[in-house]
């Protein structure tokens, strides 16, 4: 798992909302297709709810991410969490659509959060993200669980 995290995130940690988080030390859910690992979601549970720490799909367009999010939401409900949430970046347009179609709402914009993380915590963060979009901001999405 640490090697997978390092390969996908270019370090053994991710930075969400200014906090260093280590996916390999978090509980996780693995997606398999025909016996092959095709996805990983890691999460953290606290008083705020279940936060998705990392989500990686190695096969786009076949429902890996959806299945992992479904399983994580079910885990949040099982643990009695009232909130299922995550942080993504401003360049992650496809995922933003997926999250919102799932009923998640945008609840926070952290303008400049990626610039700050690059400057203070993770200098290896790319400056340009998906589709040539400058990687600058974080967006927080949540689903209230009742």
Q: At which residue positions do the language-model features occur?
A:
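Conserved acetyl-CoA-binding loop-helix of GNAT-fold acetyltransferases
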Residues: 62-74, 93, 97-101
């Amino acid at each position: 798992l640490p090697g997978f995290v390092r390969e996908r995130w270019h370090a053994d940690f991710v930075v969400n909302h200014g906090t260093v988080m280590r996916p390999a030390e978090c509980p996780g859910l693995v997606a398999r297709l025909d016996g092959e690992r095709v996805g990983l979601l890691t999460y953290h549970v606290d008083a705020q709810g279940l936060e998705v720490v990392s989500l990686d799909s190695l096969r786009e367009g076949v429902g890996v991410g959806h299945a992992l999010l479904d399983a994580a939401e079910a885990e949040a409900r099982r643990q009695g969490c009232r909130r299922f949430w995550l942080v993504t970046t401003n360049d992650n347009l496809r995922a933003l659509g997926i999250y919102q179609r799932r009923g998640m709402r945008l609840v926070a914009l952290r303008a400049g959060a990626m610039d700050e993380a690059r400057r203070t915590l993770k200098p290896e963060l790319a400056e340009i993200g998906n589709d040539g979009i400058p990687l600058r901001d974080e967006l927080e999405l949540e689903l209230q669980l009742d």
